[in-house]
Amino acid sequence: MPDNEGQHSVARRDGGWKRVVLKLSGEAFAGEEQLGISPKVVGYIAQAIAEAVAKGIQVAVVIGGGNMFRGAELSQGGMERSRADYMGMLGTVINCLALQDFLERLGIETRVQTAIHMSQVAEAYIPRRAIRHLEKGRVVIFGAGLGAPFFSTDTAAAQRALEIGAQAVLKGTQVDGVYDSDPRKNPAAVRFDRLDYNEVLTRGLKVMDATAVSLCMDNGLPIVVFDLMGKGNILRAVQGEKIGTIVCPPDV
């Protein structure tokens, strides 16, 4: 396994990231629909990832399953929470396979690794194998969250990033950064260019859930929040350009 010392420094010497985890919401995959998968959206995401790989950036992806199932919402409707969460995990795998298909159509070797064993469609999650795939220029897509209920795919993204030695978690959202309130409801909302983890937690800002933010804070792992569907934004984010909001240690 490679030496991971200094793996979470904000940028490498040439100003970009070398290895990143791209966190995508399941809702994004649905496009303008509330459920299902939009080929147009997945194709756009795959093309952007392919461009990043062509530039030598190692890209791993974690996808939510909200376009299929949301465990927390199902449990509110009376379903047992653990079972609902497992349904959500299976939904993430559907999204992973869709993205894999679009990437491979573009000639990008892709591996799906899941936290729940399903050997007919994906590899089991093995960190050292994931790192080796990335070093070979393959995209690795992590599915089924952490394989345990009560943990979000945000937390899975943070944990996977730490374990494979990624330099940042890049979270693609429907807005262009982190605001002090919802900009879709409040035209006067103020966007932050930079935040530290404690500020995110104490103010309850919508970056990631508290568990994921705390995990990143404890390990100095930067989080970049950006507008997923903005033209060229995925490539800009993975190249380490200034975009959206960065959450990082205050002294970096």
Swiss-Prot record:
Gene from which this protein is expressed: pyrH
Biological-process GO terms, alphabetical: 'de novo' CTP biosynthetic process; UDP biosynthetic process
Keyword Membrane: no
Residues given in the record as UMP binding sites: G65, D85, L146, G147, A148, P149, F150, F151, S152, T153
Family statement drawn from the similarity comment of this UniProt entry: Belongs to the UMP kinase family.
HAMAP family on file: PyrH_B (MF_01220_B)
GO molecular function: ATP binding; UMP kinase activity
Organism: Thermobifida fusca (strain YX)
GO cellular component entries: cytoplasm
Protein name per the record: Uridylate kinase
Gene3D superfamilies: Acetylglutamate kinase-like
The protein's assembly and partners: Homohexamer.
Organism ancestry: Bacteria, Bacillati, Actinomycetota, Actinomycetes, Streptosporangiales
Major subcellular site: cytoplasm
CDD domains referenced in this protein's UniProt entry, alphabetically: AAK_UMPK-PyrH-Ec
